[in-house]
A protein has these predicted regions:
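Active-site-adjacent helix/loop segment of glycosyltransferases
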Residues: 67-126
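Short, flexible, basic/aromatic active-site loop/helix in glycosyltransferases
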Residues: 1-35
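Generic structural signal for conserved hydrophobic packing positions in ordered secondary structure
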Residues: 7-10, 46, 110
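A short, terminal or domain-edge coil/loop segment
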Residues: 28-39, 82, 115-119
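Generic signal for short, ordered secondary-structure residues
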Residues: 28-29, 49, 89, 93
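A short, structure-level motif marking secondary-structure boundaries and short turns
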Residues: 31-33, 53-55, 95
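A short, conserved alpha-helix in the catalytic core of glycosyltransferases
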Residues: 36-54, 59-87
């Protein structure tokens, strides 16, 4: 979806940044390491961490709630890890990117995320 974003299409130089920073294509994923964010489809969160951070923000109608949560984890002083040995099998459908409403929700949530956190980076603040 990020690659299909009209802004990325207007500015091809953003494609490399999207691939590297958001899709994490700059490493082979064969080790466990801290990352900026992980997908919300498979997160494991300790009870203590959830008590400190809270729940997912219900203001995100569809999309970006996982990134928002991970930013909140980092801002709390905790870390988000990609665990290379963890696996999950997803069974079922996902909304099609061909539906305008679905894309609208993704774009709306992206704007909401930027308004909430700015251009946050765990490496250098916002």
């Amino acid at each position: 979806l990020l690659r299909k974003n009209p802004i990325v299409k207007l500015f091809p130089c953003l494609r490399e940044s999207v691939d590297r920073d958001l899709l994490m294509t700059d490493w082979d994923h064969n080790d466990t390491r801290p990352v900026d964010w992980v997908g919300g489809g498979f997160m494991v969160i300790s009870r203590d961490a959830m008590m400190r951070i809270g729940f997912l923000d219900k203001n995100f109608i569809y999309g970006m709630e996982d990134i928002d949560y991970c930013i909140r984890v980092w801002k709390t002083g905790l870390k988000v890890y990609y665990v290379h040995t963890a696996t999950i099998t997803h069974i079922g459908n996902r909304p099609s990117t061909k539906f305008g409403w679905f894309l609208f929700q993704i774009y709306f949530s992206t704007i909401r995320l930027l308004l909430k956190h700015g251009f946050y980076s765990r490496k250098g603040g916002s």
